[in-house]
């Protein structure tokens, strides 16, 4: 019997979308990452980076873990820290949902806020949050996760890639997923391509801030993706194409998933499915596309995604 709650990370369900996929399109399977302990895929990354830092001696038992976060990573780090006996200090912002703030606080986190420009997610905001986290980490007994530059983060998603491969019995034609730090899409791809290099990989970013596509930075409201700049560990050779999705389309799809499929998800998950539908239409009937339900809609009840 596993005694620690972090043993609940991973082995999440993979299901076939039943209603929103057109008849002549490929099948779309979604991996329900909200089945992880905190309700998001980021639990995988948080466990990986903290365990590696502790094993290497960078993180000591009495230390405080520090990170900038749009909330999902922060919740997962706060959770793993609570389970493993560390403290956690987040650089956060009012641009992100209140549910994420309250969940971090529930796990005992300390939060330093960086005020946004009318709750817009911009490159300026993200860079200010990163600078805040760096400054906090300069205190004695503090270790900065520094997810943007932390190569252990992508390794946390190797289990995700292996689970997808096994659950699909190797019958997978495309994987579609949003890019932020790029760790989740790259870590998953590394394993999928280890099994089959012919799997088509499509990265997704906000249309309003499509910097990976070579367009100007801008503001958007798809929480958790679209940094507004190219992340340091972005590897374009690990994707076959980049698709863009508008904030409105992502929000509308999140609502459709709830009403039509019974899947309660956040906006980035909506963006994933919008993009997956495009790939599925192109591939055609008989092919298989996998994407992720990144986190639960419960984290967005205070936002306009679920205000009716």
Residue map of PLM features:
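PLP-dependent amino-acid enzyme catalytic core
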Residues: 1-308
């Amino acid at each position: 019997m596993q005694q620690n709650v972090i043993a609940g990370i991973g082995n999440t369900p993979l299901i076939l979308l039943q209603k929103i996929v057109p008849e002549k399109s490929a099948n779309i399977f979604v991996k329900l990452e909200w089945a992880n302990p905190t309700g998001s895929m980021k639990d995988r990354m948080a466990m990986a980076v903290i365990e590696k830092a502790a094993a290497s001696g960078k993180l000591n038992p009495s230390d405080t873990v520090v990170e900038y976060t749009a909330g999902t990573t922060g919740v997962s780090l706060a959770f793993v820290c609570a389970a493993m006996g560390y403290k956690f200090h987040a650089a956060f912002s009012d641009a992100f949902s209140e549910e994420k703030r309250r969940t971090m606080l529930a796990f005992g986190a300390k939060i330093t806020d960086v005020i946004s420009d009318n709750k817009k997610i911009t490159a300026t905001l993200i860079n200010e949050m990163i600078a805040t986290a760096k400054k906090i980490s300069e205190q004695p007994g503090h270790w900065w996760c520094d997810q943007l530059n932390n190569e252990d983060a992508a390794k946390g998603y190797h289990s995700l890639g292996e689970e997808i491969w096994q659950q699909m019995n190797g019958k997978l034609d495309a994987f579609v997923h949003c890019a932020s730090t790029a760790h989740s899409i790259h870590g998953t791809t590394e394993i999928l391509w280890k099994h089959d290099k012919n799997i088509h990989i499509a990265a997704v970013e906000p249309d309003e801030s499509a910097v990976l596509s070579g367009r100007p930075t801008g503001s958007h409201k798809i929480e958790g993706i679209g940094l507004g700049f190219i992340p340091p560990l972005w590897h374009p050779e690990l994707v076959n194409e980049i698709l863009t999705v508008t904030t409105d389309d992502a929000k509308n799809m999140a609502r459709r998933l709830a009403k039509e499929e019974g899947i309660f998800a956040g906006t980035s998950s909506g963006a994933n499915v919008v993009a997956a539908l495009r790939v599925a239409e192109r591939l055609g009937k008989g092919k298989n596309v996998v994407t992720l339900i990144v986190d639960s809609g419960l984290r967005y009840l205070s936002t306009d995604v679920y205000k009716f």
